[in-house]
Amino acid sequence: MIWTAGVKPNLSYLENDEITKKFGRILVNNNLQIVNHKNCFAIGDISIIEGMEDLPITAQVAMQEGNHLANNLELLIQEKDPLPFEFQDNGEMISLGIGEASISGLGFTLSGKLAFEARRLIYASKLPDITESLKSASSWIFQKKSIFKKFLK
């Protein structure tokens, strides 16, 4: 397993390795298997999928790859063929400073304070544990400057 964070992975430790690289990232097939190493996988910023070189280097892609890889590993354990990865574009979210954000995708665009709060809740929903999700969401909702404060009076 290789862990990487950020948008430019450090592959210097693989210089003498037989792992194929492209654009400074590990080349994987559409099952997320490292090319020529069928029992090794790479996902996220460190990898690039053959035929999908234009995928953005974002958390959205990495999270979808992670979920897909987990499902494929389960299939492989059951001695079934892995399925090819298919990216589903769910839009983009960006913070624009304290209390401001923009969300676009799924046919709409939202910006400002409401987008800021929605973005926070979406991130909270992605936390791995429901308890942590609820703690994060409730702390944000009950903050002094939260737009939800108006609705809770």
Segments from the language model and where they lie:
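C-terminal, flexible cofactor-proximal segment of oxidoreductases
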Residues: 71-153
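FAD-site-proximal beta/loop scaffold in flavoenzymes
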Residues: 1-67, 71
